Amino acid sequence: PGEFTTAINDPKARKELIQQIIAFTKEYKLDGFDIDYEEYDNWDKNFPSLLVFARGLYLAKEKNMLMTCAVNSRWLNYGTEWEQYFDYINLMSYDRGAFTDKPVQHASYDDFVKDLKYWNEQCRAAKSKIVGGLPFYGYSWEESLQGAVDAVRGIRYSGILKHLGNEAADKDNIGKTYYNGRPTIANKCKFIKENDYAGVMIWQLFQDAHDDNYD
């Protein structure tokens, strides 16, 4: 396990980590802090300690400190206790099925909607807490783009436009390159607004187009 997982599984280290996070937030006059735990191996074993850690932070923080989290969208069990400690829950509604050899849409509109409903209906989080995640990147299985992608086939939206042309802006895939174009991003935002969810978050802004006409 990583150092963070080791710390939250040790009561003494967990207490010290909580104290340091609160102290850091105060010292630098931050609005709050975010938990983004992505060590998914042995989830069922480590999640109880993560829940205790979240509760400890919640009890230790000042009332005006924001406490947020980034969570896996739907395939890990957070239960119904997790949501109570957070002001906002940011759903990482992307990367679904992306780390395989099979070309796939990693962030479909349908999955986005299912993720939001899952956290509201199954995890009991209020809509006013739930934030839908939007990817400003995609994945490509095209041999011709292997020099443009990263180690896991990821490619920025700006890179997609650079290599596939500006017409890609209004599509969700070209060949074996999958991403979210402008219409899908707009439709996701529309669903958020019309159904009274908290809002959207972006991963991440620097991956956007460099031309205002296509961002």
Task: Give a label for each model feature.
Residues 1-41:
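Substrate-binding cleft of extracellular glycoside hydrolase catalytic domains
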Residues 3-11, 38-45, 101-106, 174-178, ...:
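Second-shell loop/turn segments in exported
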Residues 10-27, 72-81, 179-193:
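Short, acidic/polar
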Residues 19, 38-161:
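Substrate-binding surface in catalytic domains of secreted glycosidases
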Residues 31, 87, 198:
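Receiver (REC) domain switch/active-site residues of two-component response regulators
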Residues 35, 89, 132, 192, ...:
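Conserved, mostly hydrophobic/aromatic
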Residues 127-193, 211, 215:
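Glycan-binding loop/region signatures in secreted carbohydrate-active enzymes
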